[in-house]
Amino acid sequence: FLRPLGLRLCSNGNKQDTHTDTSEVVFSRQGGVYDEEFELELTSKGIIYYTTDGSDPSESDTSIKYDGEIKVADRSGDANIVSAVSPTLFCTNFSDYSKDAGLVCRIDAPSDDAVDKCTVIRAAAKDSAGNWSAVTTQTYFIGNTTDHIDGIEAGCKASGNDLAVISITMDYDDLFDSGKGIYVKGDVFDNALKKFIGNKNWIKADDTRKLDANYSQRGREWEREAHIDFFEMNENGAKQVLNQDCGIRIQGNYSRSDLQKGFRLYARKDYGDNKFRYDIWGDELKDKDGNTIDKFKTFVLRAGGNCA
């Protein structure tokens, strides 16, 4: 069962679970699409800290002590961060390898104005004993949905559904670190390439797609923690239907070496709720008794590759 999908990715700093049950932070506005910039109010019984770069406010050195409303504005002019990562690190669209030139990616990172942007606010509160609440995360788009997604009206009309847009917030290193990053070729690829090249002076670029890499690893060891905000969007606006911490892995076979990769999301008690509780496919997906299935342990975000 397929649905059209839009994906936004925001990476954060290193994360460890140091949170306990205390007064969580309440946001004055739910994540979504807003026509104009606004002032966001946060409330809690504890002292609130927040971040705007996707990092965990209970750990990050970029966290800000909340002392008044936060301006949420259009970020279309901001510089790229995740999208600025060199494609050479995570895909194999290379020119042929030679010892003189090495591996050179034929695709450049996109320009700043080519990447749609949103604002991710993460907040946590600390009580008088120094205990942190769970982190609350919300994602905001400023402008109309048509400003952010070209052709959304025609796309929704053609599919007969709203566009499912998922914002993913996770640790930057869990994506791009050479040792543990799941999105990159990484150390696994570098070691495999050394063995494959041996004494060769030249190899075909396509051969590198078949080499082992970080992104081709599987199993729980290569699952990372993430947060998702799931929106149903059309030309008239957006509705947030899921706001949840979960596990994330790379999805696919040969397509794992593509520029854009698929993801598989896992609901587990380790992260919070053990199910994604939403009828993602509406009435199209029913159980044997004819009831709409509205709880899932996992689902896949396809990237459109041949094995995605």
Report the location of each language-model feature.
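Conserved ATP-binding subdomain of kinase catalytic cores across diverse folds
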Residues: 168, 202-308
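Short, compositionally stereotyped local motifs that mark structural "simplifiers"
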Residues: 1-217, 223-225, 230-235, 239-244
